[in-house]
Every structure is written in structure tokens, then in C-alpha cells.
Amino acid sequence: MNSFPYSSIVFLFLSLILNNFIYKILFLQLCVSSTLFHLYDHEIYPQRKIYNIYYFDMVSILILALFIITNNIIFSIIITFIIIISFKKINRFSVLFYLIGLCKIVYHLLQTQNNILIISILIIAFVAFYDNDTKYSLYPYHISWKPSNALIWHICNSVFLFLYLQ
């Protein structure tokens, strides 16, 4: 089991240390979906289609990203259901709103925190993101994360979120 724990452990840790109850629930949901996804993806059935679990993971990311953007859980859930009903594939929406939420957090941190620290963490995160060149032949992936890069990416995002919520 050398691939699944990294993102799940970071999400579990965030759900334990954050004070906001809604964030606790959303990160626990993301921890469970990420664990199932990576177990099923890499460890249990590496040759099977994993789209159903991938879809659940994308829904978790979408709700969390919308909550970060709107700061309203009811509105976030309603938008998520509208997107799910309207579109069959939601992964582009999940990634789009994730990036918008990340930009909102980074912009806020650049206004309130040490800019050199924030930019350094941002550079480390994107180096870890772009250093993934392992080709992956199974749907829905094109490129698989290296375990160390996944850990670095998720920790950087967690630091941003934790600083943002303080």
C-alpha cells in the first residue's frame, strides 16, 4: 500500500484540527472518498473501471470547493446538485471550482500573510504538481501522481487552507 494513504491522511488530519464543523464533515467525507478511490484504484482492483468512486471523489471536491468560495453550505450543495443533474461529467467543474477556491485562498493570504512564505509554498506545490509524469493507462486518468508529490501537494494546500481559516 504505497499510494493511497497520502491524501487521505492529510484530509483526516485537517478534519481533526479545523474548528469549523462543516469543514470537519467535508474533509471527513473527502478522506473517506479519497481512501476508497485510491484503495480501489491502486491496491485492490488495479485493472477495473473506477469511475463510480472517482465520481464520488469529484463530488466531494466540488462541494468543498464551492463551500470555500461561497462560505454557504446550503448554496454549495444546491449548486452541486444542479451541476450533477445538468452535466454527466463533473470533473471539469470540480477542477475549475477547486482552482477558483485555491486562487481565492492564495489571494487572501498574499494580502494578510508573509508573501515570501506563501509564494514559496505555492512554488513547491506546483513543482510537485508538474513533476508527475507516470503514464497511467486506466480510465479516468492520463497521468498518475507520484506518492511523494501527492503528499507535498496536499500538505501545501492544507497549509493554505489552515492559514486562510485562522
Stretches with model-predicted labels:
Residues 1-166:
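Multi-pass alpha-helical transmembrane bundles in non-GPCR membrane proteins
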